[in-house]
A protein has these predicted regions:
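Long, charge-rich, low-complexity alpha-helical segments
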Residues: 1-44, 98-100
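Phosphate-binding loop/pocket of nucleotide- and phosphate-handling active sites
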Residues: 2-21, 168-235
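Structural motif
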Residues: 24-29, 47-50, 65-70
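Short amphipathic alpha-helical face segments that pack within enzyme cores
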Residues: 33, 150-158
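A short, well-structured beta->alpha microelement
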Residues: 36-59
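Conserved beta-strand scaffold positions in the cores of enzyme catalytic domains, especially
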Residues: 45, 89, 185-187
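A short glycine-rich beta-strand->turn/loop micro-motif centered on a GG-aromatic cluster
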Residues: 47-51, 92-93, 181
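E1/E1-like adenylate-forming module used to activate ubiquitin-like modifiers
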Residues: 59-151, 161-167, 189-221
Length: 235
């Protein structure tokens, strides 16, 4: 006598994310600890220890790179991803004596990382020499549990600034104008405990963000540069 097989158990419907989706891009042990603490149910964590490949980064509303000091290559790749997709981005670095979070890059409304790096060098900062970085790789920093908490707090603060428009931004939106958003850099001195926040001033004629105040800016021109034979379709 044949029997009817039991019906398969009902699978719960996958819920859509209720808030912005964040792509966390960790490089190194400290970064993985911070990303694990921050990532929510709808967020994605993509390790970038071997490099940041934009094709591997799924859809997200914003991207956060957490890395060891002086990872300029990763930061520039993040800038490219950010401006191509029109997606806000942020970086967190652990230095021997400080945590640095920023700049908060908002394509079309803020300066980019390249501007920040140039301004920092103008003020005397000297990163790790490229030949040392290529020979020895990233200089991974030792960290304690409270460093993870502080780093997660800085990222949360930056994302809150992104999600909560200020009075100046609301006034600009009502006047049908585009107000600058982002560009902030937050730092915590791990010796004194002093926390600071400073803006990033864009460099004139920057190749990445010189059109940052154009309200209609999007990623199509950058895409067209990769597909010259189809440039007329997106002009």
């Amino acid at each position: 006598m044949s029997t009817t097989p039991p019906a398969p158990a009902a699978q719960p419907a996958q819920q859509a994310p209720t808030g912005p989706v964040t792509a966390y891009l960790p490089q190194g042990g400290f970064a993985r600890a911070v990303a694990t603490r921050l990532a929510g149910d709808g967020d994605v964590v993509i390790p970038v220890d071997q490099g940041l490949v934009s094709a591997y980064i799924p859809y997200a509303d914003r991207a956060v790179l957490i890395a060891d000091p002086d990872q300029s290559g990763l930061r520039e790749d993040l800038d490219t991803l950010s401006f191509t997709r029109g997606m806000p981005s942020l970086g967190l670095e652990l230095f021997p004596t400080e945590l640095r979070c920023g700049p908060l890059v908002v394509p079309g409304r803020s300066a980019c990382y390249r501007c920040y790096d140039r301004r920092r060098r103008q003020h005397g900062y000297r990163p790790l020499p490229p030949e040392v970085a290529s020979e020895h790789g990233p200089l991974e920093q030792a960290y304690a549990h409270h460093h993870v908490l502080l780093g997660a707090g800085l990222i949360s603060l930056a994302l809150q600034a992104l999600d909560t428009p200020g009075p100046q931004e609301q006034a600009a939106e009502s006047a049908d104008d585009v107000a600058p958003i982002g560009g902030q850099v937050w730092t915590i001195d791990l010796v004194s405990g002093i926390t600071t926040c400073s803006p990033t001033v864009a460099v004139d004629r920057c190749e990445t963000c010189s059109g940052r105040y154009e309200g209609r800016r999007d990623g199509l021109p950058a895409l067209a540069a990769l597909l010259p034979e189809r440039r007329g379709e997106v002009a």
